[in-house]
């Protein structure tokens, strides 16, 4: 049997699935061809060496993206379309099933929404009594270090859309997902305010560059 490492990316994907591919192999499939003197696999490695992790490539603006040799406006447009389709797929997936049944989908959705933000964004997922998504709202926008959060505004919005439960989320632009004391304090304030209205706070997720910290999973709720 042929060794996995000897297969070209497309063959490897068909044989073992997309999860078996490295970042540069996935990017090579997207790029399709290389440039003169630089085969596609080498070009893919060069691109990732330039940008670093995938999230940096995906969040690059048009100028930064197209400044790299071998990349152009066509690839930029295609990548933006793929990223947006991923966001919409995850949102539709959450709309079709109770969120509590699939916490990993929630994490993936929040990563696609918040991991590239350069300032703190505080988002709330409003859920019905079956824990299905009613809507998502970016309620507060802050600096690179902190965002001002007002529990009364969250509860007001929850009552307006008749939400029975909430999932709180915000990003740390630093990439460090460990909650600060102020994160824990505001979570408790929101939780207390929600309980007065018989609304449950199911979780508070802190989004980094590639992962999420869950208050619920770490027994902080």
Swiss-Prot record:
MPN domain segment(s): 99-221
One Gene Ontology MF term: metal ion binding
Pfam families hit by this protein: RadC, UPF0758_N
Positions contributing to Zn(2+) binding: 170, 172, 183
Domain of life: Bacteria
Signal peptide: none
UniProt cross-references to Gene3D superfamilies, sorted A to Z: Cytidine Deaminase, domain 2 (3.40.140.10)
InterPro entries: MPN, RadC_JAB, RuvA_2-like, UPF0758, UPF0758_CS, UPF0758_N
Annotated motif JAMM motif, positions: 170-183
UniProt record, GO biological process: proteolysis
Segments crossing the lipid bilayer: none
Keywords linked to the UniProt accession: Hydrolase, Metal-binding, Metalloprotease, Protease, Zinc
Family from the record: Belongs to the UPF0758 family.
Protein name as annotated: UPF0758 protein HI_0952
